[in-house]
Amino acid sequence: MKLIVGLGNPESRYIGTRHNIGFSAVEKIAASFGANFSKGKGKSLEAKITHRGEQVIIIKPMTYMNLSGHAVVAAMNFYKIVRNDILIICDDLNLPSGTIRLRAKGSAGGQNGLKHIIESLGSEEFARLRIGIRVDETSLTSFSSFVLGKFSENEKVVMEKILPITSDAALDFTINGIEHAMNNYNKPVT
């Protein structure tokens, strides 16, 4: 059994924001299997799918980004899932838009949802798939305004291209593991 977690914020005002791309990614995965989200363990919504014989639990924490670890730990405890079998999908301000980056472990890199998950698990050793949201290299006056802002029309086009690839990468992880997914998907989307 695997656990895929998409990070975002629960209120409707956050739909379509850069910070909620993790929610968009897991919604795409669930929809491709005809699965719907319902009340999950802890403060989350969850969907269940089976991919090539592997049961996969997909969750969207409803705790706000900065407290995502609570929902992750609740799902891991209930389903008895170990850290090696979880994948966290989130936005990354440090990656250019149109890029995904999978890692087997690592720091939060300034992503507060990842930071709380690391604190809650007491470890940086879990897989994550970061979706680049950085549009250009100009300095931002407010990081929070940018990540909580809606995608521009051009950015939406890029995200529409990247979400199916993100879905494929996450599903590759569930069957073949993080190393295989990293080798196949750590490249810019064209």
Curated annotation (Swiss-Prot):
Active site: 19
GO cellular component, one term: cytoplasm
Subcellular location: Cytoplasm
PROSITE patterns: PEPT_TRNA_HYDROL_1
A GO BP annotation: rescue of stalled ribosome
EC number: 3.1.1.29
Molecular function terms, GO-annotated: peptidyl-tRNA hydrolase activity; tRNA binding
Alphabetically ordered keywords of this record: Cytoplasm, Hydrolase, RNA-binding, tRNA-binding
Site, as annotated: Discriminates between blocked and unblocked aminoacyl-tRNA: 9
Site feature location: Stabilizes the basic form of H active site to accept a proton: 91
Catalysed conversion reaction: an N-acyl-L-alpha-aminoacyl-tRNA + H2O = an N-acyl-L-amino acid + a tRNA + H(+)
Keyword RNA-binding set for record: yes
List of residues binding tRNA: 14, 64, 66, 112
Functional note: Hydrolyzes ribosome-free peptidyl-tRNAs (with 1 or more amino acids incorporated), which drop off the ribosome during protein synthesis, or as a result of ribosome stalling. Catalyzes the release of premature peptidyl moieties from peptidyl-tRNA molecules trapped in stalled 50S ribosomal subunits, and thus maintains levels of free tRNAs and 50S ribosomes.
Similarity annotation: Belongs to the PTH family.
Protein name, per record: Peptidyl-tRNA hydrolase
Species name: Pelodictyon phaeoclathratiforme (strain DSM 5477 / BU-1)
